[in-house]
Amino acid sequence: MKAVIPYKKSSAKSRLSPVLTREEREEFVDLMLNQVIDTLKEAGVGTIDILSPSMYGLENMTKANVLLDKNDLNEALNGYLEQAEEPVIIVMADLPLLSPDHVKGITSTKEDVCIVPGKGGGTNALFIKNPSCYRVRYYGSSFLTHCSIAEKTGQSVEVYDSFFAGTDIDEPEDLVELLIHGSGAAKEYISKKFRLEMSRGRVGLVHI
């Protein structure tokens, strides 16, 4: 089994721009990427590949292999799956609440495919036992699309239901979940910039 993490550092996480500058966002995504790599390693994943259209921010990467592919996300990932000769777990780089136990649970599925849904219909992680027989289609309601692809190709599916694994960091309100539930370098970075504040019965962010 091996893992692949799609990653692009340049101008990353534009939806966080109301609260983080471009430089801060790029620093933050780097921390999240490294945290996801460490999580995969702790879960016993031996081979970890980073699939990126650019070496920007990855020049000194030693914890994982860097594979350059300038194609769009789906084309790059499907090219990767075509060449894979062992099960593959695709993990997004913005999952700082993901734990080694989550990875072990996802990859120990008895089904052909295990899908971790993200917020708004996305796909946060996707474990594929027979990658040469599967093609991904991210963007939009990719969770439903990936379930449909498995069904149409005769592959059984498990949906891995986890709040933590399902929390990807895209919007300012997602940083609240990181501060409440997170640990590690990504949380430490955000905790130096924001604190939690109750307002009208809701927890929100306030700049320090």
UniProtKB/Swiss-Prot annotation:
Its EC number is 2.7.7.68. Gene3D superfamilies: 6.10.140.50, Spore Coat Polysaccharide Biosynthesis Protein SpsA, Chain A. Keywords: GTP-binding, Nucleotide-binding, Nucleotidyltransferase, Transferase. Pfam families: CofC. GO terms for molecular function: GTP binding; phospholactate guanylyltransferase activity. Pathway: Cofactor biosynthesis; coenzyme F420 biosynthesis. SUPFAM superfamilies: Nucleotide-diphospho-sugar transferases (SSF53448). Homodimer. This is 2-phospho-L-lactate guanylyltransferase. It comes from Methanosarcina barkeri (strain Fusaro / DSM 804). The gene is cofC.
